[in-house]
Amino acid sequence: MTRFFAGMMMLLLVGACAGSADLDDAPVPLGDFSLTHNVVVAPNAQRGPFSRPATDDQLIETVRGAIAERFDRYDGPSRYHFGISVEGYVLAVPGVPLVLSPKSALILNLTVWDDAAGKKLNDEPQQITVLETFGTGTIVGSGYPLSAEEQLLQLSQNAAKS
């Protein structure tokens, strides 16, 4: 049962790892959705093992930008607000190909508010964990072909899509 659950979670994560490839396409219909506030904070962001450093400002601005890039395309009459907390990250360092190839990851907590109802849509924050986009040097890890900033952008875009 544990293997089945782990397999299903991996399929969900792989599906979310397409980054910004679809931003030129028409947005997926979300009804009357409009993102009014896109608040991102990183008060307790934890740097994972074997990770390159990133400042709180880098984390906040990159995640906020990726959310805006994806959700500012919607202009429906129903207003929603996102509250996002960056909880942790790993920005892969170059490894040893085929022996040690660290992967990048980003962990966020998301709360959504409905403006008309004046309340949260989710009582507890929804935790989102995303991995680097597969196909970007997966054998050697993203630490070789991508800078820390490029990895963070890719992770943020994956998070916005998930």
Where do the model's predicted regions map?
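A structural "domain/chain start" motif
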Residues: 17-61
